[in-house]
Structure formats: structure tokens, C-alpha cells
A protein has these predicted regions:
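Acyl-donor (CoA/ACP) binding surface of acyl/acetyltransferases
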Residues: 1-62, 205-207
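Conserved acetyl-CoA pyrophosphate-binding loop and the N-cap/start of the following alpha-helix
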Residues: 1-2, 141, 145-153
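Conserved GNAT acetyl-CoA-binding A-motif
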Residues: 8-18, 156-168
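Conserved catalytic-core motifs of GNAT/GCN5-like acyltransferases
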Residues: 16-18, 36-51, 164-166, 182-199
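Conserved active-site alpha-helix within GNAT-family acetyltransferase domains
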Residues: 22-39, 148-149, 169-186, 192-194
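A short beta-loop-alpha structural element at the N-terminal edge
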Residues: 60-76
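Conserved GNAT-fold acetyl-CoA-binding loop/helix
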Residues: 76-102
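Conserved beta-hairpin
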Residues: 110-123
Length: 208
């Protein structure tokens, strides 16, 4: 309820929380609610009895809907992410897909974004009725939990448990398998008939 009030009523882009390193219960509660560990503030608090404590810092970013005015930023993020992770794509393929993503794929899905503390889009996800159609994270923002937060939102809030992944995108495949997805099928080509095999994944029952 507190998170919903902060994000929905106050329109906060980020909610932070601190706890002591020895307070394992608080850490578990924060992680269970989607908070991401950011780092430790050393000697952050001087108590009344003279003890000095560290603080572990956590944050949870808001998930918002972009507008059409955000599409140019989204396509720039898409290209940076693809060049960082889709090494199997040729330059010709990237230039082929770029206008399709901008003009056809983005308007065709329900888009969700996460902005960083500077207001820039750090990651975005596109959903259809039954499938996670796309997930892209800016290379500078990878490893911060943005992708995981978006996927957990798709699973818990939208009840979507399927995703397609390029077979040659090992990083994405490992990411989804770590979250509990398993391979249930394979196509030799992508949706445009290009020679990039696609793996069909679904969340295992014990992870739903």
C-alpha cells in the first residue's frame, strides 16, 4: 500500500530505504518487495550512545507508461542495447529492424519504462496479451535490477509468463532461465523470416 501510494498518488520515480547490515530480516523484506541493493554507506549513523553504524541502501524504481514523445529515446536505447548484446546481428539487420521497431513494433505493444535518478529511460518492456514481446536495458544500466523488476511486473501484475529469445543471445537466455523460465519450443527463423533462430520460453509452474 505504501509503495502504491508513493508511485501512484505522489508520482515518485524512486523510493529508497536503508537498513543496518546485521538486520537480515529487513533485508529479506526489502528484496521480497522488489527493492534493489545499491551499496553501503559506511559510518553513516552516530547513535546517542556513541556507536557508529553502516547503512545498506536499497531502492525500487517506479514502472511507468511512456508517451509517443518518448519513442525517439526508446529507439536510441534499443539500438545501444542491441549493439551491446546482439553481436550476432549484422549492421544491415540492425538498420532493417530499426524503423520497424520505431514505427510498427513500439505502437503495437503495451510499453512500460523505468527511468533512472536523472530522469533518463534506463529500460523498457513491451507486452502483448500473452507474451513479453521485448525487453531492453541501456548498457550503462545493466546489472542494476531494472530488467528483473520489469519481468516480475509482467508476471505478477499482468499474468504474462511467456517470452521469445534469440537463440544466439546467450546473455538474455541465461537471464530468463535464472528467473525460472524454461525452453518449450524453437523456430529456425525470426518473425520476419530472417535466419535468427528463436527460442520460446515459459515460466515454470513453481515460479508462478
Amino acid at each position: 500500500a505504501v509503495l502504491n501510494y508513493g508511485f501512484n498518488e505522489l508520482q515518485l520515480s524512486l523510493i529508497t530505504a536503508n537498513c543496518y547490515p546485521h538486520n537480515k530480516r529487513s533485508q529479506q523484506v526489502l528484496k521480497r518487495n522488489g527493492f534493489i541493493y545499491e551499496g553501503t554507506l559506511h559510518q553513516a549513523e552516530l547513535t546517542y550512545n556513541g556507536n557508529i553504524y553502516d547503512h545498506e541502501c536499497y531502492y525500487i524504481p517506479n514502472i511507468a507508461r511512456p508517451t509517443e514523445q518518448d519513442y525517439d529515446e526508446l529507439i536510441r536505447l534499443w539500438e545501444k542495447s542491441v549493439r551491446s548484446t546482439h553481436h550476432f546481428l549484422t549492421e544491415e539487420s540492425i538498420q532493417f529492424y530499426k524503423p520497424l521497431i520505431r514505427n510498427h513494433y513500439l505502437p503495437a505493444v503495451a510499453l512500460f519504462i523505468i527511468r533512472n535518478s536523472h530522469g533518463k529511460i534506463a529500460a523498457f518492456m513491451g507486452l502483448s496479451d500473452e507474451l513479453i514481446e521485448m525487453l531492453f536495458v541501456h548498457p550503462d544500466e545493466q546489472g542494476k535490477g531494472y530488467g528483473k523488476r520489469l519481468i516480475e511486473y509482467a508476471i505478477r501484475q499482468k499474468q504474462i509468463d511467456k517470452v521469445d529469445v534469440n537463440e544466439d543471445n546467450d546473455q538474455a537466455l541465461r537471464f530468463y532461465q535464472h528467473l525460472g523460465f524454461e525452453i518449450i519450443g524453437r523456430d529456425e527463423t525470426d518473425s520476419m523470416g530472417k535466419p535468427y533462430p528463436i527460442l520460446h520460453l515459459q515460466l515454470t509452474d513453481d515460479k508462478k
